[in-house]
Amino acid sequence: MNFIETQCPAKINLFLRVLNKRIDGYHNIETSFQLVDLYDSMSFERTTDEIIIESNKDFLKGQDNTIFTSASKIKEHLSDQEYGVKICIQKNIPTGSGLGGGSSNAASTIIALNKLWNLNLSEKKLISIAKEIGADVPFFMFGKNALGTGIGDELEETSSIKKNLLYFFSICYCFVRKFK
């Protein structure tokens, strides 16, 4: 396999209860994650050596983002470091909106590169890598509506709400990393 295309869904939190602060800096939470019909599109093409990112958003073209970080962490598991990847992303999920776009992109990158590079890493290992990237990444690896506890990484499948939702996006950016 030399090429994979995928869609990365957004999510909303139907509720969020922030509990105690942990030693690792995260907070324990209780939340309800709901996948929504808003997507970023990504493609992955096997190349040699480098990780290259092309995007409609300039800030994603460098190395300081969840896509590059995820690809680098997966690449550490290659016995043949000659593999690389060209990742193209069409960003549609508003950045900093709390909809999980970066986490969704990270999860898609982990899943796609495990397939593209034939790594056959276990689900447990993939989730472990996901947790290193961010608290919401395991939810997007899970890929279903869920009740989240712990830092949001302990997941129990829940049913979908059957209502139409109207989304409102703020022009404010939420610096999620700041609140770790």
Residue ranges, per PLM feature:
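ATP-dependent small-molecule kinase catalytic core of the GHMP/sugar-kinase superfamily
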Residues: 2-7, 15-31, 119-180
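N-terminal beta-alpha supersecondary unit
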Residues: 2-83
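Acidic active-site catalytic centers that drive phospho-/nucleotidyl reactions
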Residues: 11, 105, 136
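Short pre-catalytic strand/loop immediately N-terminal to key active-site residues, enriched for Gly-Thr
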Residues: 30, 85-97
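Residues at secondary-structure transition points
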Residues: 58-65, 69, 94, 100, ...
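Phosphate-handling active-site elements
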Residues: 76-86, 112-129, 133
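DPxDG-like acidic metal-binding loop motif
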Residues: 97-126, 139
